[in-house]
């Protein structure tokens, strides 16, 4: 009865505060039915809470990739792990290859990984002196989102990091006016850190890029 072990896992974690016992029960639940993508997602989320190394989680997901492909939230978690480990080109290709459908609690998450992948690729290109490539990638990042992401860009989107790096690339290319415009955009936003209550609130780290842009 895999569901019994899954429910026991939730009780051990949420009520008894025994994460290791919860992990053991969730592993049993999945072992009894390795076709249950939801239980696999919950197992991975438990691994995240228990600080299981990202590389281990990624390796396990690759062993169960059919399950990963069956759910948008699992697929996006896999992409997130790739971005975390610096495999941004692979992450971006996987994002482009899938048609996402928004789910409750998932607002903004697909776009966030899309932008993370592009930013990291642009940063790597700039570090190698490939400023034209970096600029091309960043112009893609600040443009409208591809339709397959399942969500559009909000007017309040905070892209200070993107515009800051774009401004630097344009500056290196001798595009003075364009660089000034980009760095000016990088200065926009709240100047004091506040707690993020909603997915579209300004991330505190954007203030750092505002400071750099000034």
Indicate where each model-derived feature is located.
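Structural signature of tandem alpha-helical TPR/SEL1-like repeats
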Residues: 15-28, 50-63, 87-93, 133, ...
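Specific register positions within alpha-helical solenoid repeats of the TPR/Sel1-like families, i.e.
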Residues: 13-14, 47-49, 83, 119, ...
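Conserved structural position within tetratricopeptide repeats
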Residues: 27-31, 63-66, 100, 143, ...
């Amino acid at each position: 009865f895999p569901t019994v072990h899954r429910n026991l896992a939730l009780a051990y974690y949420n009520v008894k505060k025994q994460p290791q016992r919860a992990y053991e029960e969730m592993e049993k639940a999945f072992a009894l039915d390795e076709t249950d993508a939801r239980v696999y997602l919950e197992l991975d989320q438990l691994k995240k809470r228990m600080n299981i190394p990202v590389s281990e989680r990624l390796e396990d997901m690759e062993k169960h990739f059919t399950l990963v492909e069956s759910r948008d939230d699992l697929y996006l978690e896999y992409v997130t792990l790739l971005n975390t480990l610096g495999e941004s080109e692979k992450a971006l290709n996987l994002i482009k290859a899938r048609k996402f459908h928004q789910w409750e609690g998932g607002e903004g998450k697909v776009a966030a990984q899309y932008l993370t992948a592009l930013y990291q690729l642009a940063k790597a290109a700039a570090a190698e002196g490939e400023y034209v490539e970096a600029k091309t990638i960043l112009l893609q990042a600040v443009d409208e989102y591809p339709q397959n992401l399942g969500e559009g860009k909000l007017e309040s989107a905070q892209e200070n990091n993107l515009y800051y790096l774009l401004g630097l690339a344009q500056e290196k290319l001798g595009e003075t006016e364009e660089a000034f415009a980009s760095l000016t955009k990088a200065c926009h936003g709240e100047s004091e850190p506040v707690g993020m209550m909603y997915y579209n609130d300004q991330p505190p780290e954007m203030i750092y890029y505002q400071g750099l842009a000034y």
